[in-house]
């Protein structure tokens, strides 16, 4: 027996509670890029560009024009996803959560927290939006399977850092539709897609932090924090992953590699770069 329901009435968490010990949750994601490409026709690179803009909701694949795809995504976001969240949780101030979604969509992959978001509302929009309300609204969006949260993990300290989290959209097309397809940021969108792909493959995904000591311009010893895009775990397997849309400059290579160089263990280190070249290992053993 398979049990499903509208987000406005019946979330997966409700199913788990209702059928505790008598069933398992099966999470259905939008199409991965591999699934998307397997059913669409045409050039691989064109399909990738299309996926980055319009995402992998199954209905999108069958639509022909860009206008049809954009209209469909805008409509389903406003009249299904967001409406379900508002109705289920009896949200009175619709403007608040609407703007919150815009803020999260504009900053996918950027570390943030309710306090920072509240300050943004106060300074830029002159709106009072409490930390608790923001936190609750973010949870509602995650429960509705619209966004996902990634915790930050101190790799050397082997502990979670509770301050800032990263938020990603479960489908890049929905994210782009919410912003009216204005902010086409390939680096951040690609990072979002990689995050979703890792979840689809069953991995536990965190954001990594590496603490190092370096010297500032005056030669003083200072503590610095380097970021690893993803710390990926499954059983006894672990991977450290960096995502780079373009890594042609030496500065960008140094930025991506430096975090991996400072990880004091031998788990596999991977750099995912935009393009369809075969994987290879550099002199440091990083898979690119």
Stretches with model-predicted labels:
Residues 69, 73, 93, 130, ...:
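Hydrophobic (often cysteine-bearing) scaffold residues that line and stabilize catalytic clefts
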Residues 83-87, 119-124, 174-184:
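Short hinge/gating elements
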Residues 102-106, 122, 199:
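Short, locally clustered residues in the helix-turn-helix/winged-helix DNA-binding domain
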Residues 109-121:
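Short acidic, hydrophobic short linear motifs in intrinsically disordered regions
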